[in-house]
Structure formats: C-alpha cells, structure tokens
Amino acid sequence: METSESTDRSQSRCLDLQPSSDGLGSSSDPFSSWDGRHRSALVAATAAASAAATAASTARAAALWTKSPAPYSHGNLLTEPSSDSLTERYTGPRFTHKISHGRLGFQPAYFSHIAWNPYTTNDLSSSRGPIPGSSSGPVPGSSSSPGPDSSSDPGPSSSSGPGGSPGGSGRGPGHGPGPGGGSGQGPGGGSGQGTDLGPAIDSRHSPGHGHGPRFNFSAPVGFRNPRGDLIPNYTGCKHHCHWEPQKQSWKFLKVSEPGARGLWKPPEVEGKSTVLSETLPRGQCLLYNWEEERATNYLDQVPVMQDGSESFFFRHGHRGLLTLQPQSPTSSCTTQKDSYQPPKSHCQPIRGKREAILEMLLRQQICKEVQAEQEPTRKDSEVESVTHHDYKKELVQAGPPAPTKIHDYHTEQPETFWLERAPQLPGVSNIRTLDTPFRKNCSFSTPVPLSLEQPLPFEPESYSQHGEISSLACQGGGQGGGGG
C-alpha cells in the first residue's frame, strides 16, 4: 500500500513539473516578471554562499560516507544517464515496473521529503534559501569521493550550455567528484555555480531568465540531513552492486556455568529487553491440544535477549512447575546425602590384614591334622545297588514239600479235580479226610452213638465198622420209626 501511494504522489508531483506546450514555463507561475537589477544583485550573493556551503557539505559527506555503508541496493537507479528528467524518471511504466519488482533498496515513501510548492515562484538568483546543489547536509550529489558517475559521461543532473532563449535548457558532460555532481552555468543565463542534488533534482529545467519554470528547490530538514544509515557509499562498489545490511559484530562470552549462553550483545541492547517474549506452543498437532501444554505455556516464556538461549534459561528446569512455592529456594537434600551412613569405628586396627590371613590359614591346617589323627582310616567301599546285590545271591531250588507220612496209593483215595472242588458244591457230605467217601452230607441226621467214635483227621475210616453201624442205625431207626 505504501509503495502504490508513494508512486501516485511522485507521479502527481512530477506532472506538475512538466512544461506547457507553449514553452518551458510552468502554468503555476504567478510571478513571471522580475526586475533585472534585483536579480543580478542576488546572483552574486548566492554564488558566494553556495561556494561556502558546498565546501562544508563536501567535507561533512566525506566523513559520514567513510563510516556508514550504502543502504541502497542499486546505486545508479536515480542517476542513470538514460533518464532525461525527474518527470520521466519517476513516472511512467518503467518506474512502476522497478518498484513492483523490488528494484528499490528503500521504500518509495522517502520521496515525500522532496517538498515543492508550485506557488512558490522565487527565482534561482533571488532565492534566500540554499540553491540546488548547495544543501547543508551530505546529500548524494555532493560527494567528494570518486563515484560511478564521476566520469565525463552526460549525467542527468549536471548541465552547462547556452540558455539565452527564454526557458531554454541544455545538456553537457557532467564532471564532479561525486555521483551526479557537476558544475556550470544554468540555462537561461543563470550564473549560479554549485553541486547538484543528484538524483533528487534534474537541472535540465533549471530556472533562468524568461518564462521558464521557476520554483523553490529548498529541501526540508529531513532530506537535507538524512540519517547515517541512508547515505550511500560508492567507494568499493561497482555499477550494479547489491547492498547488504551491516551485521552487528557479535562477541562470544565465556560462561562458567553449564549450558549454551548464546551470543554476546551490547549492554544498551540488553537493557531494553525487559519484556517477555511469548513462545509458540511446542506441538502443532496433538501437543497443542493437551491441557498440560496450555497450562504450562506461560512458564516457557524467556526474556528476549537478556539470558541467552532457551536451553540455558531452563537448564535447571521450569521455574515453579513442580512446586507450589515458586519463590522458595531449591532443597539441598539429595538421595545420596540421605542414604549415607558414616562409619562407626574410626580407630585403626591393632594388627594388619596379612597377619589375620596367616592366622586363619594356620588354624585350618591344624584342624585338619587333629581330625586325621582322631578318626580311623576308612576303606573305600564299593558302591553297590540293591538290584546288583540281589542278583548275585544263590536261589533255593523250588519243589514239592517233604511228605509228613508214608502214603499208600492202594488204600488212599487219589486227589482229583472233583475232590478238590467237592467242598464248594452244595449238599455234599462233609469231607474230613482224604479217604472220606464221596457222598451226601448227613451230619445233621447221624445218630449220636454213631458220631461218638469218629476218626481223627488223617486217619483212615473203618468202612466195615462204619457200614455195620450205619446199617444197624438205619434198622433201629426204621424200627423205632415203625414202632412209633
């Protein structure tokens, strides 16, 4: 916005400077006639004043340009030989094209310092203020050092030639120690001599006799006395050198405490940095939404230039983040100090370590000798398992048991399968001996006299007697039964 506004202002000013179609006189010149006597008297006075002002401004500009670098990116932008006038240089598509592409090293708003009143029509010779080129400050047209425009090429700001016609103008080779500087008689018979303003004023339309454009060239104080950082320096620069801003000379400061302290800064800069800078949130996605991050964001504020880098400022942690009393001093207790136990006995031992080791070895050796004398010598027994021991034992031959008496197979009943299974059968006679006949059990019905003389175990029964008794018992039983 500033560039467009300043461009419009410069175009409006330059359009006022354009001469009319009838001649070189401006349409805003209300005082067109002046007495020749007053003009010739003031020309001599202004010539002497301009010579003194030129010498003072040249010395002052030379002293300032040796200290300050050139703040412009293009030193010959306003002093191009191809530009004919101020109105042609700062109006039209070429000036707008340079502004839009960033050709200017400074903001075009600085052209507002060239104050020109179209109604102030004092003549060049009758002007009480400084004439063009005789400004009191170091302007770009009064350099005493050789510059890129100090050659004999025709410059847009210096001209000398005949100007006898009313409002006439001429161009000649510019020569001077500074860029755009030149000396010579102005057109229209003007005898004023002085250094030109360089890129600020074009001397092609310098005032003279006749109906030429006559206006006040006195620049305001802000333009006559610019700051030191706005004055160009053409000593070590070529025709199209790019200006680089002067860097502050930093000095490293050695710090005894751990951590990076950063670059050293002048004390006047450190005294101004008292405002805390608001740091951006640590995260860009999820960390920015965390409640803890927003709650502790004010603790991340670091003084801008006072305490150096952020890592050095937070080398002991965030202040007040883990305590309820931010101003309380840090506790001096540590885990190692709390767990340390001082030694109980500080006295020196009576005997040394070597003596204690020798005593222990002798004690062990004597114990082994005494134990060997008390215990008898043991033989080494062969390890033998139970299975191994039983395997070597001789087994007894298995066979039938020895007979208890002599058997007669003629009289004894043989052992058969049925005799062995006979007691298991129901309703079978009681087998008492091996020779008991196989018959039904009639023990419950045997008469008492028959059961008194029973044979002992392992004794043969008398079959004949038993048969007789049995028959008699049966007969008696039959008789008794029949008689009853």
Swiss-Prot record:
GO molecular function: microtubule binding
Short name of any one Pfam family annotated for the protein: CFAP143
Record's compositionally biased regions (Polar residues): 324-339
Compositional bias of kind Basic and acidic residues: 1-11
Superkingdom, taxonomy of origin: Eukaryota
Annotated keywords: Cell cycle, Cell projection, Cilium, Cytoplasm, Cytoplasmic vesicle, Cytoskeleton, Differentiation, Fertilization, Flagellum, Nucleus, Spermatogenesis
Tissue: Expressed in trachea multiciliated cells.
Annotated Gly residues bias: 161-195, 475-484
Keyword set includes Cytoplasm: yes
Region listing for Disordered, in residue ranges: 1-32, 123-221, 324-348, 455-484
Role: Microtubule inner protein (MIP) part of the dynein-decorated doublet microtubules (DMTs) in cilia axoneme, which is required for motile cilia beating. Plays a role in spermatogenesis by enhancing the binding of CREM isoform tau to its coactivator FHL5 and increasing the FHL5-regulated transcriptional activation of CREM isoform tau. Involved in the acrosome reaction and in binding of sperm to the zona pellucida. Plays a role in regulation of the cell cycle by controlling progression through the G2/M phase, possibly by delaying the activation of CDK1 which is required for entry into mitosis.
Family, similarity comment: Belongs to the SPAG8 family.
Name recorded for this polypeptide: Sperm-associated antigen 8
Species of the source: Bos taurus (Bovine)
